[in-house]
Amino acid sequence: MLLTLASGALFFPGLFALSIWALHRLRPGWTEDDCLTVGTRLVSSVQAVLATWAGLTVIISCKNVVSDRHWLATEYVWFLIPYMIYDFYAMYCCERCRTKSQKLTRTTIIRNFLIENRLMVTHHTVILLFLVPISQKLRGDLGDFFVGCIFTAELSTPFVSLARIMIQLKQQHTLLYKVNGILTVTTFLFCRILLFPFMYWSYGQQKGLSLLQVPFNIPLHCNMANAVLISPQLYWFSLLCKKAARLFDTAKAKKDG
């Protein structure tokens, strides 16, 4: 546990610092804000790829979705904790850089950061304070398969990150941005929304229950935890769909015009 925590604490901030240094050298014309935004998104994408790999490994290895074990289901959570803490700092750095010209006090910057990123801050805080203890201690030796499923939700993150990078670099007019938008919505739908019915279905297959019977045959806290997890995903998905609709409506209007 301690070695994994230490590895994460070195890996993510180190990768962030290396990314910023490399971007400054490779793209000297970029602003500090550009480098910070791209560097932050690169680290997020690397974490997402690692999480997805860990999740798929656990899912494939666990034939019994309730009782089978895989060491990555526990160890990757310890590796993820430093990332969550690092991500708070990275988001704060981006906010501080964005408002640098306004000469704001640190207290004002922190307040603005918490307001602008309130959903993401809440998401990370809930994971650290509630879901990590549940995953690492309270669930005992059960449910590694479902932990692996949750890891695979990160598959959509690289596409979300690429979209944010392209917006920062003012590349919204390109075909790549539109294609990436379709991939973002698709991966988000399958890996962050439909993932939850899939987990219920998998449990039902193991226990001989239909999908609709599963919620009434598992502990209440499992349903509550899933509700907490899926709620922000539904909100983010609605935002993605609205953004995608505006993007293609604009493109259609330009074509008709």
UniProtKB/Swiss-Prot annotation:
One of the record's GO cellular component terms: plasma membrane
Membrane topology summary: Multi-pass membrane protein
Keyword Membrane belongs to the record: yes
Keywords from the UniProt entry: Cell membrane, Membrane, Transmembrane, Transmembrane helix
Limits of the TLC domain: 33-249
Statement: the UniProt record of this protein carries the keyword Transmembrane helix: yes
Entry superkingdom: Eukaryota
Subcellular location: Cell membrane
Record-linked InterPro entries: TLC-dom, TLCD
TM helices/strands, residue ranges: 1-21, 42-62, 71-91, 114-134, 142-162, 181-201, 220-240
Quaternary data: Interacts with GGT7 isoform 3 and SLC3A2.
Protein name per Swiss-Prot or TrEMBL: TLC domain-containing protein 3A
Native species: Mus musculus
Lineage: Eukaryota, Metazoa, Chordata, Craniata, Vertebrata
